[in-house]
């Protein structure tokens, strides 16, 4: 009886440690986990449209990263800053599909914003929370995201 309790307790501890920390066990190798989503930085330079297409080919449900909070931006910066130094990365926000309304490529509502001008396609600095509009034909690095 004592062994059963010990083994059961041990399994419970392992389960809670994996599920409680978001240890990334749901994300494929090379992807990082945050709040139930998987993220990956790609160093290739691409146009916005090519970057979105590239992300959709990386994993089912994947798109250019959508940023829903300041905390999520901090997480993405923690990934991009060491890899890309002072670079710019495409995010999944543009008005390329609808001339007057900004939309995330994954269909999420635009709740969190970090720029002041009406953009065409949006890049984020790899080292801070600033967003900039850029012509969609320019090339930048890529961050992809999907729900785990």
Swiss-Prot record:
Residues 34-145 form the C-type lectin domain. InterPro entries: C-type_lectin-like, C-type_lectin-like/link_sf, C-type_lectin/snaclec_domain, C-type_lectin_CS, CTDL_fold. GO terms for cellular component: extracellular region. It is found in: Secreted. GO terms for molecular function: toxin activity. Disulfide bonds join 27-38, 55-144, 121-136. Keywords: Disulfide bond, Hemostasis impairing toxin, Secreted, Signal, Toxin. Expressed by the venom gland. Residues 1-23 form the signal peptide. SMART domains: CLECT. Gene3D superfamilies: Mannose-Binding Protein A, subunit A. It comes from the Eukaryota. Heterodimer; disulfide-linked. PANTHER family: MANNOSE, PHOSPHOLIPASE, LECTIN RECEPTOR RELATED (PTHR22803). Interferes with one step of hemostasis (modulation of platelet aggregation, or coagulation cascade, for example). Shows greater sequence similarity to the beta than alpha subunits compared to other heterodimer snaclecs. Belongs to the snaclec family. This is Snaclec crotocetin.
């Amino acid at each position: 009886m004592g062994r059963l309790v010990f083994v059961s307790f041990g399994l419970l501890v392992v389960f809670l440690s994996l599920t409680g920390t978001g240890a990334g066990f749901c994300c494929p190798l090379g992807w990082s986990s945050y709040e139930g989503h998987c993220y990956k930085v790609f160093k290739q330079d691409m146009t916005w449209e090519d970057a979105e297409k590239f992300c959709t080919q990386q994993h089912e449900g994947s798109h250019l990263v959508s940023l829903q909070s300041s905390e999520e931006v901090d997480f993405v910066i923690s990934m991009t800053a060491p890899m890309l130094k002072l670079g710019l990365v495409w995010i999944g926000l543009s008005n390329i599909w609808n001339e007057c309304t900004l939309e995330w490529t994954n269909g999420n509502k635009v709740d969190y914003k970090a720029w002041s001008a009406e953009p065409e396609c949006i890049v984020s600095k790899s080292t801070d929370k600033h967003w900039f509009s850029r012509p969609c034909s320019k090339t930048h690095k890529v961050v992809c995201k999907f729900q785990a």
